[in-house]
Amino acid sequence: MKAILLTAGEGTRIRPLSASRPKPMLPVADRPLAAHTADAAIDAGADEIVLVVGYEGETVREYFGEEYRGVPVSYAVQEAQTGTADAVDAAREHIDGPFAVLNGDNLYDPAAIDRLFDACPAVCAAEVSDPRNYGVLSTTDGTVTDIVEKPDDPPTNLANAGAYAFPADAREWLEVPASERGEREITDVLTRVIEQYSVTPITLDRWLDVGRPWELLEANEWKVGELEPRIDGAVSDAAHLEGRVVVEAGATVDPGVVIEGPVLLRSGATVGPNASVRGATVIGEGASIGNGVEVKNSVLSRGASVNHLSAVADSILGRNVNFGAGTTVANRRHDDADVSFTVKGERLSTGRRTFGVVAGDGAKTGINTSLTPGLKLATGATTAPGETVDRDR
């Protein structure tokens, strides 16, 4: 079965992290988000991966190439992001039999994807506490009978998780009309399949739709926690490592460092003397942590630097971010309420009591900068030495 991965979207809700790469290519543990989905599809038996690309599509092509894990890779271009059915329709020429459709910005438990492929036609569902914000599946005797978008009175608590195994006939049903929000929806294709076939619901044990920065942090918490410990890099005998810690070849850990996993140090990463790194944390390729720095539950992307005597917690730093010496990130409110974050101009609760900052590629702080919880630094943003920043910039 071919697996079609949807990776064309820009990911405006996760900006500034998606300013130069599509959301499915943001780092989750040791690979891009979309690679986890591709891995699950291949493990389930996919004999070809078809990647639908659009925004910054060359980033996707550079990573996956023409073959991934021994499986052929093809590409389809979605010229304008006008819905999920439109995205799959862009890959129509690659469809010659039953096919799976997976969102490239979702994490699925791999065992469920395996069951999805075996049960075709089928759709993955997740049990949620409040299904009113999702497409909700109705079922009878183990068969899906309907799907309703964001109902006021949900018939079940089964949310559509955006993973489908379709029969070959569905290729001819992709040209659905635009919905009320102006998009061609893959759920309309699912409705047609439900009318013609017995569709099996596959309940996910775990699922994460990564749409906003704190969900990317959660994705890393999930996947870093699954890594098998190994030490391939240079670790000082005077360093202390415990728990699930991965030090890739080319990474360096200096004397006096304390690392409490789960932590991943990518190739070329350096952790300076007397630093403290706690899970779940990813230190990306070529990223560096200076003398006496504390990093907790954060993602430092490729080439990021946190200089001496700084503290970073529950944060995401884009590529080549540079935090000057003594930069301090606050990650908790005094009233212990959930931290809020601005998404597309709207202040939203993250649902987390601890959340620090999100810094776009190339952002820089002056020495002794203080950053308040839930702060966003745009691509290339700067701060002055000694500044306290309590508004996005």
Language model region names:
Residues 290-393:
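Glycine-rich hexapeptide-repeat left-handed beta-helix
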